[in-house]
């Protein structure tokens, strides 16, 4: 059954805000390093079992966790290359891949957990790596079927990284943060973005630019080239570098940990979140693989025209292949008045939700994860879970 919907709650307009962080944010550094280690394992051994966490602070990165793999890993090289890719390549930026201290505390996975996964069985019968709840969300407000608040916040960070790399804004450093507030109108249970009310941008920078000049450059070269003009007007508020100087950033400014940006990684506060982080986890961890599946399901339902906006919940138990429950919230947007139960039946008919099948259908045994840790896990439309499945109704 569906959550009871009050039709009066789907009237009028409202403001909603989402945030994002750039590649050089300390927590995002940790996510990317964890996924770089995961990719290195999967590149040599697709059956690797990885639970890799990362912590970083001034001049230091530590990776720790449980890994069972046949791959021969050079942790120093993997970690330093990830930091280099992010852009911390000089001590003047507050962090340098060449000189940072790299600590490794990796052990093998618990044999008790391995037993629960039933490795001796066929991949299709692989049990879930843990219990948990996972959510997927999709909305027809953008072609990507993502919330516009989050999409714009991600794009602002991505475009700052591009401007830093191509030299058009050479004073930029990797640590950036963005936040976008949009005024929406209800359209039944769907939501329609009307205009951007507020944009917040904070960007780490070198010492050779003034705050006044930085604000001008960010506004003209990043914000106005990223956000479509139709969403901006004379009332749009821009908070660019609201704290003033932002020279000390990255791990020198704040400690970073894997899994601290789970809302940035997913739907920017829309929908719901089961609480499990993604980065550093292989496909047997349903925190990740089933969340990708739930997104695939939600996006497929919207693409098929069955709903305009939906939230999908899945739940699993360790060692059990089939999900324990499936839930769909359509926010009152279901075409032809389909009930939640009917939508669940369509899901069961079209998707095999066992972890061992998910990995095959979504190509999750490949070393693809480093890129997912940048600017959201659902923004890159080349990933398999972003390509809607044609449904048999």
From Swiss-Prot:
Q: What does the entry comment about cofactor binding?
A: Binds 2 magnesium ions per subunit. The magnesium ions interact primarily with the substrate. Binds 1 potassium ion per subunit. The potassium ion interacts primarily with the substrate.
Query: What chemistry does it catalyse, as a reaction equation?
Result: L-methionine + ATP + H2O = S-adenosyl-L-methionine + phosphate + diphosphate
Q: Where does ATP bind?
A: 25, 175-177, 243-246, 254, 260-261, 277, 281, 285
Pathway in which this enzyme or protein is active: Amino-acid biosynthesis; S-adenosyl-L-methionine biosynthesis; S-adenosyl-L-methionine from L-methionine: step 1/1
In the record, what terms sit under GO molecular function? ATP binding; metal ion binding; methionine adenosyltransferase activity
**A Pfam family of this chain:** S-AdoMet_synt_C
Which keywords does UniProt give here?
ATP-binding, Magnesium, Metal-binding, Nucleotide-binding, One-carbon metabolism, Potassium, Transferase
Q: Which residues bind K(+)?
A: 53
The record's section on SUPFAM superfamilies has: S-adenosylmethionine synthetase
Q: Where does Mg(2+) bind?
A: 19
Give any single GO term for biological process: S-adenosylmethionine biosynthetic process
Q: Tell me the InterPro entries matching this sequence.
A: ADOMET_SYNTHASE_CS, S-AdoMet_synt_C, S-AdoMet_synt_central, S-AdoMet_synt_N, S-AdoMet_synthetase, S-AdoMet_synthetase_sfam
Annotated residues that bind L-methionine are located at: 66, 109, 254, 285
Its Enzyme Commission number? 2.5.1.6
Cross-referenced PANTHER family = S-ADENOSYLMETHIONINE SYNTHETASE
Task: Provide the family line.
Answer: Belongs to the AdoMet synthase family.
Q: What is this protein called?
A: S-adenosylmethionine synthase
């Amino acid at each position: 059954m569906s959550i009871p919907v009050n039709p009066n709650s789907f009237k009028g307009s409202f403001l909603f805000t989402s945030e994002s962080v750039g590649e050089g944010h300390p927590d995002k550094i940790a996510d990317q390093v964890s996924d770089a280690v995961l990719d290195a394992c999967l590149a040599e051994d697709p059956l690797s079992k990885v639970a890799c966490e990362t912590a970083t602070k001034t001049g230091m990165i530590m990776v720790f966790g449980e890994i069972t793999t046949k791959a021969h890993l050079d942790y120093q090289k993997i970690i330093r290359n990830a930091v280099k890719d992010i852009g911390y390549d000089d001590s003047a930026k507050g962090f340098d891949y060449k000189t940072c201290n790299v600590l490794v505390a990796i052990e093998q996975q618990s044999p008790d957990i391995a037993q629960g996964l039933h490795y001796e069985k066929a991949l299709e019968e692989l049990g879930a790596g843990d219990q948990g709840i996972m959510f997927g969300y999709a909305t027809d407000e953008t072609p990507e079927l993502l919330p516009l608040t989050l999409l714009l916040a991600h794009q602002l960070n991505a475009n700052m990284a591009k401007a830093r790399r191509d030299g058009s804004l050479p004073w930029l450093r990797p640590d950036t943060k963005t936040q976008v507030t949009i005024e929406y109108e209800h359209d039944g249970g769907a939501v329609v973005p009307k205009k951007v009310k507020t944009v917040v941008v904070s960007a780490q920078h070198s010492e050779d630019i003034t705050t006044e000049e930085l604000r001008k450059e960010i506004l003209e070269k990043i914000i106005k080239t990223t956000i479509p003009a139709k969403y901006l007007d004379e009332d749009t508020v821009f908070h660019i570098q609201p704290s003033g100087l932002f020279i000390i950033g990255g791990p020198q400014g704040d400690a970073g940990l894997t899994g601290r940006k789970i809302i940035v990684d997913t739907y920017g506060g829309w929908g719901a979140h089961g609480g499990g982080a993604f980065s550093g986890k292989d496909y047997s961890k349903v925190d990740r693989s089933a969340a990708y599946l739930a997104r695939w399901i939600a996006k497929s339902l919207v693409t098929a025209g069955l709903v305009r906006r939906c939230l999908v919940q899945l739940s699993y138990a360790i060692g059990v292949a089939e999900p324990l429950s499936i839930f769909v919230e359509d926010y009152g947007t279901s075409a032809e008045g389909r009930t939640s139960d009917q939508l669940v039946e369509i899901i069961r008919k079209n998707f095999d939700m066992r972890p061992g099948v998910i990995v095959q259908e979504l190509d999750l045994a490949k070393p693809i994860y480093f890129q997912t840790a940048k600017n959201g896990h659902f923004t890159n439309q080349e990933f398999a879970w972003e390509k809607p499945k044609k449904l048999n109704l």
